[in-house]
Amino acid sequence: MANGSDTKPVPKGPRGARADDTRTPPHPDRRGSDRDQYFSKDRSYGGRTDRDYSDYDRAYPPPRDYDRYGGGKYGKYDKYDKYDRYDRLDSHDYPPRRDRDYDRSRDARDTDSRDYGRLPPRDTRPPPRGGREYRYARDERGWDRDRRDLDRDRDRDPRDRERDARDRDRDRDFRDRDHDPRDRDPKGYRPHSLDPLPSRDRDMPPRERERELVRERDLFSRDRDLITGVRELARSPPPPLRDGRNRDRSNDRHDRSFDKHTRDRGTRDRDTKEKGSVISTPQTAPTPRLTPTNGKPDLPTSQPPAPPSPPRLKTFPKEVWETVGRKNNTRLTYDPELSKDKQKGKRGIYEEVKKGASTTEDPRSKHPHYFKTSSKSNKKPYQRLPVPRFLYDANSIAPPPSTQIIVKGLSSLTTSKTITAHFKTYGELEAVNMVEDPATGSSVGACLVRFKVTKNNYEAAHECLKKAIRGQKTGRIDQAKYRVEPDEDGAKAKDIIKRVAARAAKKAMPVKQPPTAPAADKSIMEKLPTPVPSARPSPKAAQLMKTSAYIFIAGKYLPSEKVFASDIRRILRDFGWFDVLKEGDGFYVFFDNNRDTVECYEAMNGRKVNGHQMAMAMIRLSRVAPKTKESEENATEQAPKLPPKEEARKLIVQELANSLRKDIRERVIAAAIVEFLNPARFTHIKQDPEPSAATEPNTVNASAARVDTPEPVQSSSAIPGFLPRFKIKRKGDPTKKKDATKKNRKKISARPMNHVLNDYYSDEEDSTRMSTPIVPDTSADAAELPIRKPRKKISQSKQRIMDFSSSEGSNESEEEEEVEDDMEEEEDETAQEELQEASTLDTSQQLTTAFGEILDWAPAHGFPQPVTADKKGGALTTISGFQALVKDDEDMELLQEALEGIEPEKINGEAWTWTHKHLNEAVAKENAEFPELAAPNAFVNSTGSWKSQGYFKIPEAAKSEYLPHRKKLNIPIDTLQMENREKKKENASNSRVNRANNRRLVADINMQKQLLSTETDVLNFNQLRKRKKPVKFARSAIHNWGLYAIEPIAANEMIIEYVGEVVRQEIADLREARYMRSGIGSSYLFRVDESTVVDATKRGGIARFINHCCTPSCTAKIIKVEGQKRIVIYASRDIAANEELTYDYKFEKEIGEERIPCLCGAPGCKGYLN
């Protein structure tokens, strides 16, 4: 050997014991022989190989079952590994190998450990030279320990080591909790490197290293204040008791202290332990133990009397009571031992218990399945019995299970049909109701779905509800996810509506209040008297004064050349006026109600406009006058208050629309009606007798009057919201001469524009719309214009001037553009002949004949001669008669000379002339249309005055003789007789044959549906279309347009279906309000049921033109056709040809302003529609 020793190592047992069990300690001179036997002197391998370690293996063989149990470092006998002796050197670098995890946090922080309690796998070869495993080999201090001490430590029982070990928790050196248990050895000690069988317990920490759950010092720190108080309290006597009955038993024991010997337990007080409170019983000094001198216990002897107790105090110290009371009347809300919160600190937090507070409940009672399992038994403990669930039936007291759900997260465009199709897969549905915004009527993205309950089986419907809730995870509606929640009473839907309304109210802009005007000067106000209208107002102002509140502003304080109506509108723009009119004596400002009138008067009276002060007179609307027919026709629906920009834009658009309507009416529609009403096309109609010469105005005079007077486009009897009634004024021209000026000639545009009326599809025939180009095409217009023949001689009896005037005002609504043209487009044979004859004319002749006639006159030569004969009789007092006196420029010059000395008034001459001529226009039209009824002789009063005769009732039959609308009711309209009466009636069939044919047609369609697998558009054709009667719409004597029967209709026959756009009730209400604001006087809304309305205002058939009558000829019924509700008009009696169709609107009865006058004129007329 290296040290010169020839002794071989003695083999040892499996636990490190020697084979001979002699345990003879080695000679001191031989220490370290084992180390030098296998290592070189430089403490390294020295280039040795595995063969050099074979002697060591023979000296310390492993047990026989080494290979049987796996062997190696990770087997049963890992300590016998041949390289295990080298692993002992790095015990401080790797965690110890142990069976259980003693310190998990320590092992988790060790980055070198991959397996808790195990070393990572090593290479089978020795570690490299100079590795860290041998860094302690160079330290001589680890090899100076005696081998006997090593053997003793190795063979020592672990329990003895635990017994002799120091208490690390109590020792100051081991107070640190993060102390590594593997560093328990002194720094100078190192284990022997060649110890073949080191003790496994060497690397194990002692059991005292475990941290105690409850330590004495923790208890002391937590209850330090309590213990201090108790100790102080123990030194003082308790307070006196209230009575003797409630005396503590501990006091009785102290009173009988000399009856028997007290048991001494040292310093422990038995009374304190029994009672559990140191406050109730005072502590006494312990009795000393008597011990005999011989060391044996002696019999008990009498004890000397105890020293007297200190006198009792009447009251405790204040600080003691505060300390004890705070602890006894409080409860612990924060325990630092149970929850570690750095913000709350390490001390407990107490809360004072108030009187009358609710007792503390066991938190386990809130959890029905709370239980404590036993760690010793694997058997599942018995839980609480399940509560039985009973099925709902008629005898159940509890409410039924929920069957309604609310679907959220939907798109606002999602319809109820889509939701129905989706949730039908979960069960049969009873109702699907969309949650709608009450303000707009649109969906808010939610829907209520209720499952159907059949035969009181609520459980089945509830199961469908559960399926729908479970299906929301994967289901989608319109490619979007949705949420489903039970909502039996609809409370969640109401909450959604409230949130939507609150959001809309929040977004709404606050209404700006009108600026407060500065107070006017009272001195000036007192000086200005209340103005009074002096002149007679215009008809329009007079009519508005009857039905509206208004303010009159005197014109004598406001010069007309400096203040205009636009200035008044600008100053009063913040108030709710709807019209401002300028009259001769001042301005009239009209309001809808008295409140706006009072506000305007109080704020603006005395204010200055362009430097001039306003003097106002307020006239309130005290009583609403009963509406007459004329007032009903002139009443217009006023738009709501708008901002100034919106109002200006609306006014501009309205004026442009009125101008456009006027141009279309005068240039397009007039020409179309002229061509359509060509007398050549109505030769079979009876001609009216020619008017007398006294009633026929002079053609030249009328033309001259139109030169200085603007063309009237508005009538006082206008009915807003409907198409104008075009009338023909037949005016003869017996004094027409060739010397008439070319300047006064009226050109008539003759372009046919029948397609303008055809804005919507007719219900009788399918036709495509005809559009009017924006930029007119001259060539196309010229081609469409009918070219007239040149006439060599025109008889005076046939010469006429077609003057067209509209009975509508400038407030005509869109209804004018929505009238259907159900008239057939056919070409007149006469027009074709004229076109063929005109093809030979040159271009100049075509243009001349297209736009006007060539009058028979030539330029005059020489001195001027009178062109017309003077009209005999006195001078006329009307504007037209006065204009008739002026024939030419010479007459105008003479008139000017005659009026030189008269100072003209400062008025607008054109407006004044137009107003006065416009007053009698309606009467002139009636006289021109019915000249024989203009002055009926049947009711000429003998006295010459109607006032002198008094009031008398005129019979209904007599009214039909002279009233125009009554006469129209009795006499069929001639325009309905346009059809060729020469057509043979061989194809006519009675109503019974028609019904039979219709039934056969319907049966054939149903048979084809059954034969074909799929339905086509042809089979889905509306069946009612084939059953309708031939009807036409035309001007009605009752109101605007009406529907007329072309052929006789028998009673109880179906006439036509009321077709329109099907909308909900909420949408219908909004549309009705919009129609009224836009000026559409009539809205064609027909209610089908409580939630469905048919709107035929803009999309509908000609059935919407049926008027109301108190004695109707038709009735409306709602029938079902293939599951859909239809509105059908049936004949209630036999209807003759060309008779107007009417039915009762059946409006609800109302009173006051809401009543609508009835214009049917029937003998049984009620007077009002409602």
UniProtKB/Swiss-Prot annotation:
GO cellular component terms, A-Z: chromosome; Set1C/COMPASS complex
Where in or outside the cell is it found?
Nucleus; Chromosome
Reaction(s) catalysed by this chain, per the record, are: L-lysyl(4)-[histone H3] + 3 S-adenosyl-L-methionine = N(6),N(6),N(6)-trimethyl-L-lysyl(4)-[histone H3] + 3 S-adenosyl-L-homocysteine + 3 H(+); N(6)-methyl-L-lysyl(4)-[histone H3] + S-adenosyl-L-methionine = N(6),N(6)-dimethyl-L-lysyl(4)-[histone H3] + S-adenosyl-L-homocysteine + H(+); N(6),N(6)-dimethyl-L-lysyl(4)-[histone H3] + S-adenosyl-L-methionine = N(6),N(6),N(6)-trimethyl-L-lysyl(4)-[histone H3] + S-adenosyl-L-homocysteine + H(+)
EC nos: 2.1.1.354
Q: Which SMART domains match?
A: N-SET, PostSET, RRM, SET
GO biological process terms, semicolon-separated: methylation
Q: What class of enzyme is it?
A: transferase
Q: Name one Pfam family in it.
A: N-SET
Key words of the record: Chromatin regulator, Chromosome, Methyltransferase, Nucleus, RNA-binding, S-adenosyl-L-methionine, Transferase
Disulfide-bonded cysteine pairs: these are none
Q: Which residues form the SET domain?
A: 1029-1146
What's the domain remark here?
A: The RxxxRR motif forms an adapter helix that bridges the nucleosome and ubiquitin.
Quaternary structure note: Component of the Set1C/COMPASS complex.
Q: What does this protein do?
A: Catalytic component of the COMPASS (Set1C) complex that specifically mono-, di- and trimethylates histone H3 to form H3K4me1/2/3. Binds RNAs which might negatively affect its histone methyltransferase activity. COMPASS recognizes ubiquitinated H2B on one face of the nucleosome which stimulates the methylation of H3 on the opposing face.
> What is the name listed in the Swiss-Prot or TrEMBL entry for this protein?
Histone-lysine N-methyltransferase, H3 lysine-4 specific
